[in-house]
Amino acid sequence: MNRRIDDACEVEWKRFEAADYLVVTLNPKALSDVCLGLCMLREQLLPRIELGSDSKTGTLSFERQSGGATTALVRRDRDKVTVLLGASDLAMLLHFFLRTVRDGVAEVDHIDVDAVDRTGATTSVVLKFPLHTAPVSADEMRRRLGI
């Protein structure tokens, strides 16, 4: 059994400095459902969660990698992209999503997951959050860190 969440995101491949990046813009209305799906994936209650795009042009799937994989793997097949997550990446994503659902906004505008494709080339999965807090100035950051 899989979990499918329609209208959850927009998926776009971008190229920058000879590398491909998967840019996923998340629909704020779907964050709770995506968070629940990630929880179920981590607990191995589901083999996969599928995020349908708002424009109905593609699907993004998250699966859990078996074993102790430390780097995410991205598989691209026409209008479907699958991201296989290791335990640490899955835990990091889940923690970030839980905090975002709790607070109603993300702490930052995006998070990156380092990955490789089938050929071993490095890539990145960029998850963009439209609802996020304002950036913090350098002075404010120093103040918060006591520097």
Give names to the regions the model predicted:
Residues 1-147:
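Positively charged, low-complexity terminal tracts
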